[in-house]
Amino acid sequence: MGDVQGKEGAYTLTAESDKVNITGNSYGGVIAGIESLRQLFPPQIESKEIVKGTDWAIPAVNIQDAPRFEWRGIMLDVSRHFYTIDEVKELLDVMALYKMNKFHWHLTDDQGWRIEIKKYPLLTEKGAWRKFNSHDRECIRQSKTDNNPDMAIPEDKIRIVEGDTLYGGYYTQEDIKDVIAYAKIRGIDIIPEIDMPGHMLAAVSNYEGVSCFNETGWGSVFSSPVCPGKDSALEFCKNIYAELIALFPYKYVHIGGDEVEKTNWKKCPDCQKRMHDNNLKTEEELQSWFIHDMERFFNGKGKEMIGWDEIIEGGLSKTATVMWWRSWVKDAATKATAQGNPVIFTPNGQFYLDYAEDKNSMASIYNLDTTDNLTPEQQSLI
C-alpha cells in the first residue's frame, strides 16, 4: 500500500514487459488492482477447467483508478430463498471481481430465520423452515414447464417433519465466521440485517411476549410486528442483536425498519401506554421510538445503524444511515441529507435485480442521477 490519491479503494496498476506493480491507498485498493489485473488476462482465466493453447499475455498499461462511491454493495436475501455457504462465497467472488466492497446480508424475514441465535434456538429449529408458499410453488412450476434447473428447489434444502414437506435452512455461528473470513480476504465488509420491528413473523410466531397478542399472522398488508410496548420484546430484540454484534466485526448493523403493520399497535394496551408515557402522538412516532432505542443499544456496543428509508418517518436520529429503496418516495434522500444523514442509494426502480428488463431497463439503471436536487454538501453524503 502507498500514497494513492482518491477515495478509499483507489489504486494504480502498471504492467511492463518484466513486472506488474499494484499500489493501493488501502487493502481494498490493492484488491481492486488485482481484480483489474485479472480482467486484463484472456477470459479463459475464469475457466474452472485446465485451459491449453492460450497466450497468457496482458497489455502494457498504466492505470490510475479510484471509485466514485466508497460504498459499492449488493444485498442477498437468504430468507425468501436460502443460499448455502458455498453459494454465498460464489457471490463474494463475483463481488470482488466487480470491485464491490459491501455485502448486505438480509438474514431474516417472515419467510425464514437464517442465523443461529444460541439464546433462542427455536428461531432456527422452527423459524428456519416453512411449507411451500406460492412463490416456492411457482419456482417449482417454472423449473418443470420451462425446463429451467435454476428455478428448482434443491433437495438438500428440503426435509420431512411429521409428514410435512418443509423448505429452508440456516447458518450456524461457525458458518458465519467462515464467511466473514472469506469476505475479509477479498476486501469485502459484511452488513448483517435482522429486520425489525416488522418482517419478524419467523420470530414472533415461536416466542411469547414478543408480539402484541398471542395470535400472530398477517394484517391487512404486512405481518404481525414486534410489540414496542413490551419490555420483554425489547429485551428479546437486544439479546438477538447482542449475539449478532459479537459475530460481525464491522462498523454497521442494519435494523431494517421497513413495511411495519401498525394495526395491532393501535389497539395494544402496552403500545398505547408506551406512547402515553413518552408523549408520542402517532404509531409512526412509536416506531421511531423503537428504532432510536435500538440505535442507542447499537451505539453502546460501538456500532452504527443503517435502516430502510421508513426510519425517516416519525423522526430520524442524527447518527443513522438511511438506505433509500422506495423509488416512489422521491424526497427521502433530500430529507435525510438535509439534516446531515448519509444515504445509500438502493432504489427499487433501478436496483432490484429480480425485475424483468421490460420494467427495469439497463438505460434506467445507467442514467440514474444520484445528485438530483441535492446541494454539493448533500451529494457528499451519498
Give the positions of each predicted feature.
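Solvent-exposed loop/turn segments at secondary-structure junctions
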Residues: Y27-G29, Q39, H81, D110-G112, ...
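Short glycine-enriched loop/turn motifs at secondary-structure junctions
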Residues: A15-S17, S220, L316
